[in-house]
Structures are given as C-alpha cells and as structure tokens.
C-alpha cells in the first residue's frame, strides 16, 4: 500500500482541486515515521529525475534531522545531489529554529547552494513564503508544479499553535503550483484533537502498528520483553484513502525495517484472519470467555420471561376458560359473567384477556393490553 501512496503523491491532484496530502502517524512503540518519509522522498526524487512525475521539483523542509542526513540518504539510493541540481531545494529548519545562531558561523559543505537556512519557525507566514520561493526557484512562476515534503510537524507544533499549523498546511494544499504534500507526526506527543485536525486536512493517513503491542502496566512485561525486542522493527502498515463522495478505502500490509531502510510486503492470509479476529475484540482488561462451570451455572438461571412451571404443561388462557378441572367449557362466557365470577370468588386484581376473534392465535404479536379488563 506504500506503493499506492507514492503513486497518489507522484500524480498529484487534478487541475482546480486541492493537492493530495498525507499524514504519516508513528508512535513510541513504532517510531518509523521518518523511515516512511525517507522511502517516499527517494521514490519521488527518482520519478522527478525520470520525468514520470506531475511535479518537476521537490522542496524538503527539515525539522527533526539535518539536511546532510537526507543528502546522504539520497546518495545511498543512487541519487546524487550536486550544487547544480535544479530539481530539489532544502529548507533547513533544523539547525537554528529559534534564530539564536549567528548566520556567519553557519556553514554547509555538500550541496550548500541547495540548502537555505530558515530561522524563527514560529513565523508561519514567513515559512510559507520561503517554501513558495524555494519552489519557484525550481519551476518558475508558471503552471509547472512541485511537491512539498515536511519530515516532521512535531517540532512545528512545539513552536506554534494548532490552528496556525493547520492553516499553513491548508495554504500549501491550496496553492496552484503545489502538486502534493506529506508530513509525519508522532501521535503519542499530542492530544487527540491535534491528531484529528491533521487527519481532517489529509486525504490519506498512514499509521504504523507494532507487531507485538506493549503490555498494559507491568503485567506480563517480562514475558513480552523478548518478543518486543525481537519484533521491534516489524509491524503493520495501515493506510486510509479518502475517496470521492465521502467513501473511504482502508488497506494494510507488513513492514520490516533493517539497515537498508524500510521494506513492505503483503500480509499472509492466516495473519489477516488473526488480525481481523483480534481487531473485533474490545480492548478490555477482563476475560469475556466463560469457563465450563460458569456456563453450567448460567444455564440454571431462570429468566423472568421464561416459564417457571417445573415441567408442567404450559397452558395459555385465551379468554374462553379453555380448561377448568379437566372439563372443556364449550359455551363462551360474556364479559359481565366473567367479572361477576371474579368478584364473587373474592379474588381481585386478576388480569383477564379477551380475544378479538377465534381466528387470532394465542401467541399473536398484537398488544394484549388493547383488550385489558380488570
């Protein structure tokens, strides 16, 4: 499904539509959002160089890692970035996000002409202008488009309020020259309303789920320690696509992180059934299954709506005195006679039902209180 995300970002949106946006959600248990960002970054770079992308340039905004890290990543994948490259620009928000370092003392070695130092990341209007300016250096001011990659919005949310950050991302999607946008987010660092706001802006959401979830509290912590360590770089990669007319498509696959990077593979059928079964069970701390003894005791309980006649034959009164002392009463009694008999017998408070007709079955679904006579 990572390939489907890449194709969406590569192809971009239709003319007049907002640019596709992707949120990559990671957690402390599965902190591989930057690996997914690196996977998309290298694939988009390859497609731009091959002329197979709707965009002709890429603007990378770095918050969590230095620009040299991404230059080295591209180099490892066989993508050489030189000072004469006309397809990529890097906006460095990692080196001096608060503007405390003297610019004269800051130097870049490899690809320094491609890297622009951006200070004071809390000024989002200035950041937006810097992104557009960097993109236009690549594609000009016409209809040619470029894509925008933000390695992490965690640091951006640290310096700016959520409404301002969502406004920046919305403005990027709305710009006519931006073909696609993607960013990563650690959901454990933010409130649920922040995550929901970013998901609302996005047209795609990808979240990483660990193969061995962490145990609650200290229970079974030692038992799961070895399996957690062994399967730390493995897990599930779930993707949700927002389609037209409010439809949603959800897809999943497995991921594995090694020294070469992150790799994706389809989920086996057995694992799919097990995962689907586990997902249907609520996340509770008590056992929902009954033991054999509990099941036997449960069957002994007589519920109020069940017959409690200890094996005797069940007789339903149909309003005509069906059985009295083993003799069948053939002549129906009038309502006045029945009321007289009840009063004379000294019994009060009995409920007597009269059937509307002989065609009505005793177990009819009609409300018997319609003919109630006390």
UniProtKB/Swiss-Prot annotation:
Pathway: tRNA modification; 5-methoxycarbonylmethyl-2-thiouridine-tRNA biosynthesis
One cellular component term from this protein's GO annotations in UniProt: elongator holoenzyme complex
InterPro entries: Elp5 (IPR019519), P-loop_NTPase (IPR027417)
Residue span of region Disordered: 352-374
Keywords: Cytoplasm, Nucleus, tRNA processing
GO biological process terms held by the UniProt record: tRNA wobble uridine modification
Principal location class: nucleus
Keyword tRNA processing belongs to the record: yes
Keyword Cytoplasm carried by entry: yes
Compositional bias per record (Acidic residues), positions renumbered to this chain: 359-374
Gene3D superfamilies (alphabetical): P-loop containing nucleotide triphosphate hydrolases (3.40.50.300)
Subcellular location: Nucleus; Cytoplasm
Family: Belongs to the ELP5 family.
Function noted in UniProt: Component of the elongator complex which is required for multiple tRNA modifications, including mcm5U (5-methoxycarbonylmethyl uridine), mcm5s2U (5-methoxycarbonylmethyl-2-thiouridine), and ncm5U (5-carbamoylmethyl uridine). The elongator complex catalyzes the formation of carboxymethyluridine in the wobble base at position 34 in tRNAs.
Subunit annotation: Component of the elongator complex which consists of ELP1/ELO2, ELP2, ELP3/ELO3, ELP4/ELO1, ELP5, and ELP6.
Protein name: Elongator complex protein 5
Organism: Arabidopsis thaliana (Mouse-ear cress)
Organismal lineage: Eukaryota, Viridiplantae, Streptophyta, Embryophyta, Tracheophyta
């Amino acid at each position: 499904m990572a390939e489907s995300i890449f194709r969406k970002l590569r192809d971009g949106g239709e003319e007049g539509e907002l640019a596709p946006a992707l949120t990559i959600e990671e957690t402390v248990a599965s902190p591989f959002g930057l690996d997914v960002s690196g996977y998309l970054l290298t694939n988009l770079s390859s497609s731009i160089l091959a002329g197979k992308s709707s965009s002709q340039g890429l603007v990378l905004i770095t918050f969590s890692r230095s620009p040299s890290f991404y230059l080295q990543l591209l180099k490892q994948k066989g993508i050489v970035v030189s000072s004469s490259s006309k397809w990529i620009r890097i906006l460095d928000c990692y080196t001096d996000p608060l503007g405390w370092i003297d610019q004269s003392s800051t130097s870049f070695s490899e690809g320094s002409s491609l890297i622009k130092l951006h200070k004071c990341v809390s000024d989002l209007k200035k950041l937006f202008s810097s992104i557009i300016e960097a993109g236009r250096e690549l594609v000009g001011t016409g209809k040619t488009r470029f894509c925008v990659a933000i390695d992490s919005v965690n640091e951006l949310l640290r310096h700016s309020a959520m409404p301002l950050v969502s406004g920046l991302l919305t403005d990027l999607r709305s710009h006519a020259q931006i073909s696609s946008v993607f960013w990563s987010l650690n959901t454990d660092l933010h409130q649920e309303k922040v995550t929901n706001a970013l998901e609302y802006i996005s047209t795609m959401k990808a979240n990483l789920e660990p193969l061995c979830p962490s145990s609650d509290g200290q229970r079974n912590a030692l038992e799961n320690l070895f399996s957690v360590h062994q399967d730390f770089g493995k897990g599930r990669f779930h993707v949700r696509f927002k389609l037209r007319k409010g439809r949603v498509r959800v897809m999943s696959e497995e991921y594995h992180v090694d020294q070469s990077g992150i790799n994706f593979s389809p989920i086996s059928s057995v694992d799919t059934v097990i995962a689907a079964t586990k997902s249907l069970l609520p996340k509770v701390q008590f056992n929902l299954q009954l033991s054999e003894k509990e099941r036997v005791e449960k069957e002994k309980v007589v519920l109020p709506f069940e017959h409690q006649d200890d094996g005797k034959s069940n007789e339903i009164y149909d309003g005509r005195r069906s059985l009295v002392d083993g003799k069948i009463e053939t002549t129906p009694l009038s309502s006045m006679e029945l009321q007289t008999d009840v009063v004379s017998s000294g019994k009060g408070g009995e409920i007597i039902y009269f059937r509307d007709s002989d065609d009505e079955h005793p177990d009819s679904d009609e409300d018997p209180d319609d003919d109630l006579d006390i």
